[in-house]
Structure formats: C-alpha cells, structure tokens
Curated annotation (Swiss-Prot):
Species this protein is from: Homo sapiens (Human)
Effect of residue 559 to E: Increased GTPase-dependent fusogenic activity
Binding site for GDP: 104-109, 175, 244-245, 303, 306
Enzyme class at the top of the EC tree: hydrolase
Known tissue expression: Expressed in peripheral tissues (at protein level).
Segments on the Lumenal side according to the record's topology features: 498-499
Identification of the protein by name: Atlastin-2
Region of interest: Linker: 466-474
Residues given in the record as Mg(2+) binding sites: 108
Compartment(s) where it occurs, according to its Swiss-Prot or TrEMBL record: Endoplasmic reticulum membrane
Gene name of this polypeptide: ATL2
Primary location: endoplasmic reticulum
Region (N-terminal hypervariable region (HVR)): 1-60
Residue numbers bearing the Phosphoserine modification: 24
Pfam families per UniProt: GBP (PF02263), GBP_C (PF02841)
Length: 583
C-alpha cells in the first residue's frame, strides 16, 4: 500500500477485543510459518487481544466463528467492523477474493502467495526469495484441518485502478469442506456465505474436476441462492476453478488457456447426457456471471512429503512457481480486479458489513432447508416413495369398503377393516428394500401410520355423511331444543316463573334462527363456515346433553322393564304353585 494509506490507517482509533490464534505447540512451529517482516504471525489457539495491538501488525482475523457443539456459525461483528469501517476505506468499492474447497488442499498456502503479491506487486520478484519462509494465513502440512469458519486478512489493501479509481481489496480464507467434524450443512453454509460475499470465488480442487465436485458446487450455490431474497439475474460473479496437481499437461497445458479448454469440455451440455448431468451444468452457468479455470502443476515431492516444509521457494518445483507467477496477477493485478456487486450495484466496505450481518442471520435461522448428503437424500426419497406406495394401497382398499359409491357401513365393521388394511400397508412398507437402516426407516413407518390414521378419520366422516340419521342430527337437535324450551317455557309461565319463561323463549328463538340458517346454508352452499359452526354447536349439544340424557332415560326404561318382567315372572310362579297346592 501507499505510505499515505499506511499513515492514515495507523491514525485510526481501534477499540475492543478481537480473536486471533497463536501457535502454542512447539512442534507446529516447524510446519507453521513463523512471524517475519510485514506479513504478521500465524495463530492457532483462541486468545483475546486488544484490537489496537492487532491493527499494528497484519494478521488473519476470524470473522465467522464455527461452533462445533451445535454446528452453528456466529459473526464477529466487532472484528469485521474494525477492519472494514476504517475511515480511509469504508466508502471505497470493495474487491473480495475468497478461496474455498475441500480441506487440506492448500487454500491457505495459496492465499499467502497472494499476500506476497499484494505487498510487493510493483516488484518483478514479488514471489520472494528462495530461502524466505511463507508467512500470512495459518497453514501446515498434514491430514488434519487447519482453518475453521471464515478468516480475512486484517489489512485491507487500497489499489489504484487503471481508470483512476481506488478500490479496497480483501482476502478471505474459508474452512475446508468435507472434514470429519463438519456436516453437509456446515460445508454448504461456509461455501455459500463466502460465495455470496466475494467478487471472485476460487474453487480449489485437486487433480481434476469430477462429477461429485460439480454436484457439491450445485448444492452449495443453490443454498446461497435461496438465502438471497429476489434474484432477477445471475446471483454470483466470478468463479475460478483452480485445479491443483494437474497431471495431464499433454492434453491441456498448464495455466489459463489450458484451463479454459478443459472447463469448456467439462461444463459442456450434450444432447446424449442424462438429464441430471445436464441440469448440474445449466445450474452452474446460470449462477455465475464469469467462469474460469486455471491448471496448476504439482509443487513437488518435497512439499508433499517433507514435514519440515515451511514454504521456501527452493523446495518448490519450477513449473509450479512459473504458473504461480501467472495465476496470482490474474486475480489481483489492478487491471484484473473484480469489484463486488449485488443486484447490479457496486458494494462498498461499509455495505459489505451490513450484507454479512444480514446473511449470517439467515443461516442462523430455520428459514432455509438443511442440505443433506447424497446418501441421506436418497434414503429419504426411497423411504418417502415406500410410504406413498403403502398409503396408496390403503386408500384404494378403503375406497372399496366405504368409497363414494358404497353404502353406509357400521362403525365397528369400518374399524375392523381399517385395522386389517393398515396392517397390510405396514407389511408392504416393510417389504420394500430401503436405504438408511432400521432406525432411519422406523421414522418413516411412524409417519405412514400417522398418515393412515389421518386418512381413516376422513373415511369415518365420509361414512357418517351417508347415515341419514347422522345427516339429520343437526336439525333434529335444534328441533329438540326448541321443543324442550317450548314445554319448559309453558310450565314456568304457568307457575309464575316469568323470567325463566322469557329465557326459554329466547333460546327457542335462537334455535329457530340457527335451524333456518342451517337449512339455507345446506340449500345454497353459501356461508359454509357458519354452517360448520352450527353443526359443531349441535354436535356439542348432542354429545354433552341429549345423548347422555337419552342414554339415562333408556337405561331407566330398560331397568324398569327388566324389573317388571322379573316381578311378573315371580307372580306367575307364585300363582302356579298356589294352583298346584289347591289341586
């Protein structure tokens, strides 16, 4: 950066605490790049340091924190604001270059060469000396993940464009996908969030572009597209496929031109392709305004196998260094910078802070569906198909029992048929070969049983509708209320209880209004909601008052009849014995 910019930055007040990570493991000091010159330190263990100290020394700052216990993400708003809201940059249009991809594929390693270029872009030897360790973003050899969440370099570079304007350049490092501690949702969230906030997303791949790489890209970009409210154009800007360890230079040469030819072949939509493969390629073309590809050779055996490798150029193959000198300026040279745009409008540093806040809230909420692995998605589809088939079998069989053209069936017979057919449907579900295991499939069997019970409840209502007495229950109930109120009104009026008589007349009038309204609703089909309310009131009166009263009266009549029969029988026996004695 220019000296004036550094002086202005040094004068900015910075308060509060930031998270940074410092290497405490002595053995890691060999693999990690230690602090040198202008590129700051490597950090590993979570520490809190004063932001004044952090701003005095360039270093990576974690702005999106990954919580492994609940697989959620948190934005460190204070850290992001203190980086992007510095007075000399906050109103500048921003360029965000992000590197994403699978874990342990050298994303942070690549970003550190980008840092070298940004600090020495005016020099032909920006790539550094042969014995100079690689510093900047934390990186190391090995098979365990290093970066979590999203980190940015805390020094925002102010660059003069060829057209005379100034832009701010921010470098972003992301958590590697598909490690042993991250879910598909974690990977999708990090990739989508970095793609949504970057102007250039470098998709870091190893050796080749495989079909699963494209499918994961489709899933992750769709997850990001869903989070953006209204999209009338391609939602994302530039995607650069970076193929590391390219082993086929005899087919496609290293660099941009070879990558362009290779990418065109990989993303070509062919008529004889399966529809699934065509859709993946169409989706990628529809999501990004610009697509590119760069083929990078293997850095050499010393880089891959030497545990003490610290990024010195003397240990890296010449082919790799040559192509690296072409790649980094392709992304970061002033004439090649891509300014961040959202919905066609340029984004400033100040704007990007607000977009980060808005996007992280979306991913912290439950509005978006949770992305799933291919196995889980296939197992779900497999089980749902089995549920649908078994439910369809149950419905068709029940239609034969009490369908629209079938007569009314006794409730006890209907329930017996239901239980038999439910068992048949469950057996059919179990007989289908399904993915996911017994515990996973059990949830879908429970879902099937619940759906069958819900369908059975509808069949009960349909069957009850065929019962003429059930259909006449509402008018009969209302008429019974009117008749009872008429009798009670007459009796209470006769004995002088006029207030009760008036109340009974009022209830009788309401019942008459309900009866007339119900008849109109059934005749015209209008005001069906009112008709439903009247049916519910009548149902409540029937179940809570009239039916219990009728049952009690019937029990009393039956009891009286039995008593009279017993008495009559005893009387007959006594009379018979008396006649025998007389004879």
């Amino acid at each position: 950066m220019a000296e004036g910019d550094e002086a202005a930055r040094g004068q900015q007040p910075h308060q509060g605490l930031w998270r940074r990570r410092r290497t405490s493991d002595p053995s890691a000091a060999v693999n990690h790049v230690s602090s040198t010159t202008s590129l700051g330190e490597n950090y590993e263990d979570d520490d809190l340091v004063n932001s004044d100290e952090v701003m005095k020394k360039p270093c990576p700052v974690q702005i999106v924190l990954a919580h492994e216990d609940d697989h959620n993400f948190e934005l460190d708003e204070e850290a992001l604001e203190q980086i992007l809201l510095q007075e000399h940059i906050r109103d500048l249009n921003i360029v965000v270059v992000s590197v994403a991809g699978a874990f342990r594929k050298g994303k942070s390693f690549l970003l550190d060469f980008m840092l070298r270029y940004m600090y020495n872009k005016d020099s032909q030897s920006w790539i550094g000396g042969n014995n100079e360790p690689l510093t900047g973003f934390t990186w190391r050899g090995g098979c365990e993940r290093e970066t979590t969440g999203i980190q940015v370099w805390n020094e925002v570079f102010v660059i003069d464009r060829p057209n005379g304007t100034k832009v701010a350049v921010l470098l972003m490092d992301t958590q590697g996908a598909f490690d042993s501690q991250s879910t598909i949702k974690d990977c999708a969230t990090v990739f989508a969030l970095s793609t949504m906030t970057s102007s250039v997303q470098v998709y870091n791949l190893s050796q080749n572009i495989q079909e699963d790489d494209l499918q994961h890209l489709q899933l992750f970009t769709e997850y990001g597209r869903l989070a953006m409210e209204e999209i009338y154009q391609k939602p994302f800007q530039t995607l650069m496929f970076l193929i590391r360890d390219w082993s086929y230079p005899y087919e496609h040469s290293y660099g941009l031109e070879g990558g362009k030819q290779f990418l065109e072949k990989r993303l070509q939509v062919k008529q004889n392709q399966h529809e699934e493969l065509q859709n993946v390629r169409k989706h990628i073309h529809n999501c990004f305004s610009n697509l590119g590809c760069f083929l990078l050779p293997h850095p050499g055996l010393k880089v891959a196998t030497n545990p003490s490798f610290d990024g010195r150029l003397k240990d890296i193959d010449e082919d790799f260094k040559r192509e690296l000198r072409n790649l980094v300026p392709l992304l970061l040279a002033p004439e090649n910078l891509v300014e961040k745009e959202i919905s066609g409008s340029k984004v400033t540093c100040r704007d990007l802070v607000e977009y980060f806040k808005a996007y992280i809230k979306i991913y912290q909420g439950e509005e978006l569906p949770h992305p799933k692995s291919m196995l889980q998605a296939t197992a779900e589809a497999n089980n749902l198909a089995a549920v649908a088939g078994a439910r369809d079998t149950y419905c068709k069989s029940m239609e034969q029992v009490c369908g629209g053209d079938k007569p009314y069936i006794a409730p006890s017979d209907l329930e017996r048929k239901h239980l038999d057919l439910k068992e048949v449907a469950i057996k059919q579900f179990r007989s289908v070969k399904k993915m996911g295991g017994d515990e996973f499939c059990r949830r879908y069997q429970d879902q099937l049983e619940a759906e069958i019970e819900e369908t059975y409840a509808n069949f009960i209502k349909h069957n009850d509708g065929k019962n003429i007495f059930y259909a006449a229950r509402t008018p009969a109930t209302l008429f019974a209320v009117m008749f009872a109120m008429y009798i009670i009104s007459g009796l209470t009026g006769f004995i002088g209880l006029n207030s009760i008589a008036v109340l009974c007349n009022l209830v009788m009038g309401l019942a008459l209004i309900f009866l007339c309204t119900w008849a109109y609703v059934k005749y015209s089909g209008e005001f069906r909601e009112i008709g439903t309310v009247i049916d519910q009131i009548a149902e409540t009166l029937w179940e809570q008052v009239l039916k219990p009263l009728g049952d009690n009266l019937m029990e009393e009549n039956i009891r009286q009849s039995v008593t009279n029969s017993i008495k009559a029988g005893l009387t007959d026996q006594v009379s018979h014995h008396a006649r025998l004695k007389t004879d």
